């Protein structure tokens, strides 16, 4: 056995290559695929000079994230300051994960005040996730506000174990 093949003679460079993870950027297509695979993420927004992060369920469609929320501080804040960020992760291990961050403006969907087509599309998508959305059998009737977030900025990152 040569020195190179003998584990007792492994070089420091070989040890580092085995130990250190690789960090990568995801392509836009990989980022969109990750968003499409999941339905729970976190929305981040500024409220009272602080950053707040809340979990939400969502459906991704093209360049839009559709979700629903309830009246309250998050809704009031986002109605006035619509710029926000959204993140979803897929973690398999400490150094084996994918993460996507979306930044953009949140738009409240109301068929009477805005685009009825956008509202209808959002409702269809949310019903594909929770069939009783906005019906008598809705499991979360307090979440009565439909919104969408345009993926104006999309950034994907990943970590992979070392070689």
PLM features: what roles do these ranges have?
Residues 38-70, 86:
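Short beta-strand segments
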Residues 38, 53, 60-62, 79-83, ...:
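Short connector loops at helix/strand junctions that flank enzyme active sites
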Residues 16-42:
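Short, basic/aromatic recognition patches
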Residues 2-22, 90-163:
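Charged, gly/pro-rich active-site loop segments
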Residues 67-97:
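Helix-adjacent hinge/juxtasegments
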């Amino acid at each position: 056995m040569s020195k190179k093949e003998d584990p007792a003679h492994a070089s420091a460079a070989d040890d580092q290559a085995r130990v250190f993870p690789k960090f990568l950027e995801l392509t836009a297509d990989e980022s969109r695929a990750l968003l499409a695979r999941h339905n729970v993420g976190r929305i981040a927004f500024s409220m009272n000079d602080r950053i707040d992060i809340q979990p939400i369920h969502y459906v991704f469609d093209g360049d839009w994230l559709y979700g629903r929320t309830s009246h309250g501080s998050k809704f009031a804040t986002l109605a006035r300051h619509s710029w926000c960020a959204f993140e979803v992760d897929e973690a398999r291990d400490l150094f084996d994960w994918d993460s996507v961050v979306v930044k953009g403006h949140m738009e409240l969907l109301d068929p009477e005040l805005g685009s009825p087509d956008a509202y209808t599309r959002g409702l269809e998508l949310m019903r594909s996730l929770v069939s009783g959305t906005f019906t008598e059998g809705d499991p979360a009737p307090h979440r009565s506000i439909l919104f969408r977030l345009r993926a104006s900025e999309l950034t994907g990152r990943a970590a992979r174990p070392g070689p």
